[in-house]
Regions:
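Active-site phosphate/pyrophosphate-binding segments
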Residues: 7-45, 157-253, 332-337
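C-terminal active-site/capping subdomain that shapes the small-molecule cofactor and substrate pocket
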Residues: 243-325
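Active-site-proximal catalytic alpha-helix in oxidoreductases
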Residues: 147-155, 196-198, 210, 215, ...
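A generic structural motif
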Residues: 76-79, 227-238, 284-293
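Glycine-rich phosphate-binding loops that contact phosphosugars or nucleotide phosphates
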Residues: 38-181, 195, 260-286
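A short acidic, often aromatic-flanked loop/helix-cap motif at beta-alpha or helix-coil junctions
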Residues: 140-145, 237-239, 292-297
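Short, small/acidic-rich helices and loops at N termini and domain boundaries
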Residues: 320-337
Length: 337
């Protein structure tokens, strides 16, 4: 039985459990590899990642992970059209899990009108009908639970396009499985962290390549737990956010610092001081860090863990982590207007 056959699409905890295995499901076809080889034959000025919600976050992870390795810009678009500076020397990677995301379809039409080089990642829908160079992915699971599928695909396509060494996702998956065995030992059990958020508001704080992890964690609390959450980036948050919490509001916050193994000295100092300032306010900040790991391992191990935290919080809040009723209603009304 393969990984996808083991997954229950109506059980979010089950889907999160299979996070590591989902990193290894997709193989890039010879046809797409050939297209990427053609793209490489000409100058590549930049890569633009297009998507919304769970389909966009794979681009953000790729952008932050590769930002210190590449000499070209990586840009994420969450909108109906592409910036004017994205021309035919860029590669546009459009991701829509359902294939029917209206903003992404609009951006694809915009790219086609401008004769841009595109790669589409989707399971079905309009994107697969009108797009060129489509990478087909399985459509069985919830879009936000499909993040490992989407990210491994987006990163691999980027590496192939730029002749970068391909990431060994089998090794990364094995690392994540070993990390999950440490939940309740090195890391608190996810239910323990979720209980800290019950009737409180999580504030995820990160810097550098862990910023998209904080953003993803915030979104997972919103969608899975039906619960408010926020995220912020150091150093920017030191110039505004730390003044934003009056005592009556601050007591409702639970700051969670996502720490990395490669923090620059000035960032390390800022995070330490920010932690102390929150302690001075009477808060109880939490620190999460994956020791002895490479950046990508840190990013994905924290993501896997925090995904499970969001599911446990949903259970505590008596929320259905699978349903997204308001998002569905908004889409229904948009389709009518």
């Amino acid at each position: 039985m393969d990984t996808l056959e083991k997954i229950n699409p109506q059980d979010m905890k089950n889907m999160v459990t299979f996070f590591p295995e989902l990193l290894n499901v997709i193989e890039i076809s010879p046809q797409i590899k050939s297209v990427l080889k053609e793209f490489r034959a000409e100058d590549i000025k930049g890569i633009c990642y297009v998507g919304m919600g769970g389909s966009s976050i794979a681009g953000s992870y790729t952008q932050y992970y590769l930002s210190d390795k590449l000499k070209i810009p990586l840009h994420v678009v969450r909108n109906y059209s592409l910036p004017k500076y994205v021309d035919n020397k860029w590669i546009v990677i459009l991701t829509s899990y359902s294939g029917n995301t209206e903003e992404t379809i609009s951006s694809l039409r915009n790219a086609m009108d401008r004769n841009l080089r595109t790669i589409c990642i989707s399971s079905n829908g309009k994107i697969t009908e009108i797009g060129k160079n489509v990478v087909a992915i399985p459509g069985k699971i919830q879009p936000r639970a499909a993040f490992p599928l989407l990210f491994s695909t987006v990163l691999t396509i980027t590496e192939l396009a730029l002749s970068e060494k391909n990431t060994d996702f089998s090794r990364v998956a094995d690392f994540l499985k070993e990390q999950a065995k440490l939940w309740g030992k090195v890391f608190p059990e996810p239910i323990e962290v979720a209980s800290l958020f019950h009737h409180k508001i999580p504030l995820y704080i990160a810097s550098g390549y862990l910023v998209p992890v904080a953003y993803r964690a915030k979104c997972q609390i919103n969608e899975n737990s039906k619960h408010p959450a926020f995220y912020s980036e150091i150093p920017e948050a030191n110039h505004n956010e730390i003044e934003g919490f009056a005592d009556s509001i601050a007591k409702e916050l639970v700051p969670i610092f996502l720490r990395g193994n490669n923090e620059k000295q000035e960032i390390l100092k800022r995070i330490d001081i920010t932690y102390d300032l929150y302690k001075d306010m009477g808060l109880n900040p939490l620190v999460l860090k994956v020791d002895d790991a490479e950046p990508l391992e840190e990013m994905l191990a924290l993501t896997h863990y925090l995904d499970m935290v969001s599911v446990e919080l949903a259970f505590l809040d008596k929320a259905n982590p699978v349903s997204v009723d308001r998002i569905s209603e908004l889409k229904r009304r948009m389709a009518q207007s």
